[in-house]
Amino acid sequence: MTNLQENLTALSADLAIFERKIQHLAKEMTIDLSHYEIDHLALRVNSEQSAKNWLILLLKCGRILSDNIVNGRKIYLIELEKPVKFANQFVDIIELPLPKNKKYPIEGWEHIEIVMPFLPKESINEWINRVNMYFLXLTQLTIKVSEPKVDGERLPNPSIAVSFTDKTVNHTCIKVHPYSIKKYLRFSKNE
């Protein structure tokens, strides 16, 4: 087994459990993940050392695509040399934010981000209202609307995060954005 294969095995050790939890959440959200691009998978860590360990591991499998400051903290986007299969899609981006003051009950795989594009001539508020309508009647879910602020970024980045209200069994989250992260990065570089 090569070093890359060993690293990918370590990287994906908990991925199958995470995938099942995400599929359960998607079912409760009444969305079919195959209808949407899974843009990237995201990790959460509570310490600088955990972040460093994950970054070392991820860099053995890929390269830094971005290390922007988002909402006051550095978030690494790692582009994998070999995409991982997740929910019958191949995903090549892993998000690794440096820790902030919040403590996560479970470190490791935390959320995915999917793309629900704007409709023609749709405003940000119209997009938020449209996406929100999918989930408002689902009382077992928590919905959080935000717009992450990336230093120097001008493209609107609304986000709708959906998770279970009771996180004791399933702590995962599905975040919805109108653009893929690669499109954001291309747009930022072309300005």
UniProtKB/Swiss-Prot annotation:
Any one of the GO CC terms: cytosol
Pfam families referenced in this protein's UniProt entry, alphabetically: YecM
Family annotation (PANTHER family): DIHYDROXYBIPHENYL DIOXYGENASE DOMAIN-CONTAINING PROTEIN, PTHR37519
Family that this chain belongs to: To E.coli YecM.
Name of this chain's protein: Uncharacterized protein HI_1581/HI_1582
